[in-house]
Amino acid sequence: MDSLENQFLIAMPSLNDTFFERSLIYICEHNEKGAMGIMINRPSGIIVDELLQQMELAEEPQPVTSLGREVLVGGPVNPERGFVLHTNQDCWSNSDPITDSLMLTTSQDILSCLGSDKAPDKFLIALGYAGWTRGQLEQEIADNSWLSVPATVELLFDIEHEERWQLAAESLGFDIWQLSNLAGHA
């Protein structure tokens, strides 16, 4: 299977009553060792400003650019660890480029700049991530748990959280609710 890096994983409707029900995951890394992604459509209930104040990184008052933005639940793995997915800006101590225009940063130095003129143009913050061991994601796709589509910056950063799964599914060109997770064999 080709790498799914820089793709969205769309949870099939059959994944109901699971952690990943109606989830949309941005795949940050996918190789022979496994895969890692950030769920981008489940708000945690924590506002970015509150997180920065709890970490004593916020200056008062917080600039309007981050006001109201929510921290996301990135996935069930390491939920205490923060990830910042952002447009390219190479000045943080622990940033990994994903594409020419997107990076994933795990260092705290980026947080102190959010809301200032030093912040990336577009960003989202997530706690935790979704991870798969070698071959696990490929098997889940074969089991019809996930569909994939190319990621877009617009869907990552500009669309409301609650609309992301449906809009990603609509980009496939058919009604996801009409799909069955059962596969036939001839």
From Swiss-Prot:
Signal peptide (residue range): none
Instruction: Give the species this sequence originates from.
Output: Shewanella piezotolerans (strain WP3 / JCM 13877)
Q: What is this protein called?
A: UPF0301 protein swp_3600
Origin superkingdom: Bacteria
Pull one GO CC term from this UniProt entry: cytosol
UniProt-listed Pfam families: DUF179
Q: Which family does it belong to?
A: Belongs to the UPF0301 (AlgH) family.
